[in-house]
Amino acid sequence: MEAATEFVVESPDVVYSPETIEAQYEYRTTSVSREGGVLKVHPTSTRFTFRTARQVPRLGVMLVGWGGNNGSTLTAAVLANRLRLSWPTRTGRKEANYYGSLTQAGTVSLGLDAEGKEVFVPFSSLLPMVAPDDLVFDGWDISSLNLAEAMRRAQVLDWGLQEQLWPHMEAMRPRPSVYIPEFIAANQSARADNVIPGTRAQQLEQIRRDIRDFRFSAGLDKVIVLWTANTERFCEVIPGLNDTAENLLRTIQLGLEVSPSTLFAVASILEGCAFLNGSPQNTLVPGALELAWQRRVFVGGDDFKSGQTKVKSVLVDFLIGSGLKTMSIVSYNHLGNNDGQNLSAPPQFRSKEVSKSSVVDDMVHSNPVLYSPGEQPDHCVVIKYVPYVGDSKRALDEYTSELMLGGTNTLVLHNTCEDSLLAAPIMLDLALLTELCQRVSFCTDVDPDPQSFHPVLSLLGFLFKAPLAPPGSPVVNALFRQRSCIENILRACVGLPPQNHMLLEHKMERPGLKRVGPLATTSPVLCKKGSAPTAPNGCTGDANGHSQAEAPQMPTT
């Protein structure tokens, strides 16, 4: 069925006003206790009131690494869609779209219509969201190339599209950025001709001035800052240096070790702007997280989940969920863009290796039948730099699992990932969903004071390889669980129950739900002794496309 564009929930629990959507929602879950070796499961229920502001702001996005492949590609994508561009290719004419974006190209099911068919709507229609074509971009880069030149250097887009975008992008020039050579590979020094001078404290203040200038000059209501620059080496968490907000701010003032990405995170938080980390390093050290908590500013990370790791988070979930014991995961990549060149240095590769390797942890821990405590699959990650392949990353994976009675199963997968074309829609979703979360507040029957989501915005886990979560919160990596989390929270905001995929209406011998349509019965089917009527629920008796001579007779009690 073709996706509709808008809907209204007709329920006494949902109230629409010009300013807000207010929904009463019953959150049902379970708590588990252990008593004498027996697990006691206790169903619980909490009454939530969600309130979502309907007024969509004028939103600006500042990209750290704006002139890189990801930044130039995202900017080009929004411009191409805004201008409704099309261009010729060897396989025919292509038109601008937002394929790869959960919010712009995904759909959700609202339920069944009168004929028992599912009704789907665009994901973006669940709640009022900023239109991506309306986004305003700015940012920083250690390279001084304008965005048109950066787009050409990236070699991601077809030439015909580049030619049309050139006059719209050549006036866009990144602001100077922070360059600390020891945090990125030495091979990046050739690009570093556009840097902020001075001490760490002076650099922090310059970033803050840049954010304020962008907000004022572009007439923006909100700004979100997103790190899409080089992968940095890990920063050691040291008591007295970066373990608390106070210590981190003092470290910056004293000019001690702090990474460029952490400087941008601190500046964003101090300016009240959400900060999202799209690279694998530990940008959000404990001091930065504490500062975000103190200022009630959203932060999220780490590392865009775009290609090989997204497939891994599905495939391992499938294998373990099917009862197969995955024992070996070997992942090999080669790519030729600047990300690959930077990752050719061991300290930067180590950051990426950590984020890629942790993606299966929650799936392994979810099955104590297969894995004993502390047991993990062997997991090897290799990344090589091959300049010729450019942004077209090759990913090869081998998954080996144990079967029953000593058997083994091996899956080998080759995946060609257009790196920036996969990352750009993720960056778009991060900005749109983060802004939406800023307009949602809620209270509960036991805590009537309005509150927002936790500053560590774990709802964004679907979009990150190594998702951050609040202290003590479980980390979820399984892709479909992550997507369901986003969808069901947005459904709750309009008073809809979570999507459970049960479809009980279609699994009953005698449907008790009244429907209108050609397959509906005119009167309820009565339960009597003896054989049940043939196909009382409208079943045709067809199985896998093959008609049956006679529908099965179901016994009754």
Swiss-Prot record:
Residues 527-557 are annotated as: Disordered. GO terms for molecular function: inositol-3-phosphate synthase activity. Pfam families: Inos-1-P_synth (PF01658), NAD_binding_5 (PF07994). Expressed in testis (at protein level). Pathway: Polyol metabolism; myo-inositol biosynthesis; myo-inositol from D-glucose 6-phosphate: step 1/2. Keywords: Cytoplasm, Inositol biosynthesis, Isomerase, Lipid biosynthesis, Lipid metabolism, NAD, Phospholipid biosynthesis, Phospholipid metabolism, Phosphoprotein. GO terms for biological process: inositol biosynthetic process; phospholipid biosynthetic process. It catalyses: D-glucose 6-phosphate = 1D-myo-inositol 3-phosphate. Its EC number is 5.5.1.4. One of its GO terms (cellular component) is cytoplasm. It comes from the Eukaryota. InterPro entries: Myo-inos-1-P_Synthase (IPR002587), Myo-inos-1-P_Synthase_GAPDH (IPR013021), NAD(P)-bd_dom_sf (IPR036291). Its main location: cytoplasm. It is found in: Cytoplasm. The keyword rRNA-binding does not apply. NAD(+) binds at residues 67-70, 141, 177-178, 188, 191, 228-231, 278-279, 303, 306, 337-339, 352, 390-391, 419-420. The modification Phosphoserine is found at S279, S357, S523. Its cofactor is NAD(+). Key enzyme in myo-inositol biosynthesis pathway that catalyzes the conversion of glucose 6-phosphate to 1-myo-inositol 1-phosphate in a NAD-dependent manner. Rate-limiting enzyme in the synthesis of all inositol-containing compounds. Belongs to the myo-inositol 1-phosphate synthase family. This is Inositol-3-phosphate synthase 1. The lineage of its organism: Eukaryota, Metazoa, Chordata, Craniata, Vertebrata.
